[in-house]
């Protein structure tokens, strides 16, 4: 869906199908996980990574009111994020909706410092964190700006 958007296919039928699917899978209390919203009539818990990714994918295609609960969930989880992947997708998702992060440098430093006890993070995770740090308009808008030559 992100690739379709960046390539100019936001109005394509497949993109619209993806929007409907993502909105259908949004948890009633906000956020997304990796599949269904409930199992055995129990609402599942959202995950920061998938919530950030879904918010990034949906920006400009749904209203802010449609995702307000998910943005609130992600903001409430920020203080607990300790891995490059979770912090990166949360940051990208929030930046896409023009949300700012409090003390982002400290959060990144905290995540990177954990390597001392956990060992080095993989290159892909660190690269995603670096990308999130530099895409203050979110991933889709940043890539669209690059394509149009309007990069900062």
PLM features: residue spans?
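Amphipathic alpha-helical segments of tetratricopeptide repeats
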Residues: 24, 75-76, 112-113
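An alpha-helical repeat/solenoid feature that recognizes helix-turn-helix modules
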Residues: 1-20, 28-69, 77-104, 117-152
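Protein-protein interaction modules outside structured cores
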Residues: 108-109
């Amino acid at each position: 869906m992100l690739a379709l958007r960046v390539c100019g296919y936001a109005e394509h039928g497949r993109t619209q199908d993806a929007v409907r699917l993502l909105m259908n899978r949004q948890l009633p209390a906000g956020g997304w996980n990796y599949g269904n919203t409930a199992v055995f009539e129990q609402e599942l818990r959202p995950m920061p990574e998938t919530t950030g990714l879904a918010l990034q994918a949906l920006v400009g295609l749904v209203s802010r009111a449609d995702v307000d609960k998910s943005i609130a969930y992600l903001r409430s989880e920020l203080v607990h994020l300790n891995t490059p992947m979770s912090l990166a997708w949360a940051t990208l998702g929030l930046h896409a909706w023009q949300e700012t992060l409090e003390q982002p440098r400290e959060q990144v430093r905290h995540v990177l410092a954990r390597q001392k006890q956990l060992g080095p993070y993989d290159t892909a995770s660190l690269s995603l964190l670096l990308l999130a740090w530099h895409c203050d308009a979110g991933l889709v808008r940043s890539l669209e700006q690059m394509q149009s030559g309007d990069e900062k």
